[in-house]
Each structure stands twice: as C-alpha cells, then as structure tokens.
Amino acid sequence: MSKKFLIIGATGSVGSSLSKLINDNSLEAHLVAKNEEEVSKISDETGFSYSVADVLETNFIEKIEKDLNGIDIMGIAYCVGSIDLKPINLVTKKDYLNSFGLNFFPVIDLIKKFQENLKKN
C-alpha cells in the first residue's frame, strides 16, 4: 500500500510550494483543492494524485477518502487558511465563527478521520 502526505489547500502558495518540495525529495502526496484547473496543473508537474473538495462543504472528507483508494496517509498538511484583519472593535461573532469554520474545524475533522492511519505511519 502506498504511503503519502495529504496536502489540503494544495493550490495556495504554501501548499503548492510544499507539493514541489515533497516531490523534489522523492516522496509522495495526495493533493486537495477546490479549484480543479489549478490542482490538476500541480498534479501534472508532480505526478501526484488529487481530489477536488472544499473544506467548507459537509462531505469534503468523504470526497477525499473516495479518491484515496487505499492510500496510507503518513501526514497531513492543512494549508488552507484566511485571516480577517480589522480592529477588534469591528470584529463580530460571525467573523469569529467564519474563521473557525475555515481554519479550525475542518482540520480537526481530518485528524479524527485519519488518526488511526496516522498513528501507524
């Protein structure tokens, strides 16, 4: 069974740079991004498999899991993120919830889903 890193947010500057670094070190990865056109370009450059999924969708893990097809995950790089910069007196509860919805909850769900796989690798 193949062992790969899982790179979520593979089309951003951090995720794409990490993909190239992993490839340069003769390691393997499975890329995940919401933009198929962009992630397929990185896949073509690296030869890595990929999934198209948006972490804000409730079924994003199922989409990824379907595409993994028996691949062992040896590490997760969560390269998705956003920061809403504004003075604290202008920040609303909705801003906090949106930030946690993107930057925190999806990565916790990923770790919960793949924790047994990560432990053995």
Go through each PLM region and give its residues:
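Conserved glycine-rich Rossmann-like NAD(P)H-binding loop of the short-chain dehydrogenase/reductase
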Residues: 26-40
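Conserved NAD(P)H cofactor-binding loop of Rossmann-fold oxidoreductase domains
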Residues: 77-85
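Rossmann-fold cofactor-recognition segment
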Residues: 44-59
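Conserved Rossmann-fold cofactor-binding substructure of NAD(P)-dependent oxidoreductases
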Residues: 56-70
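A short, exposed helix-loop element centered on a Lys and neighboring polar residues
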Residues: 111-112
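Substrate-binding pocket helix/loop in short-chain dehydrogenase/reductase
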Residues: 87-88, 95-100
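N-terminal Rossmann NAD(P)H-binding glycine-rich loop of SDR-like oxidoreductase domains
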Residues: 11, 15-20
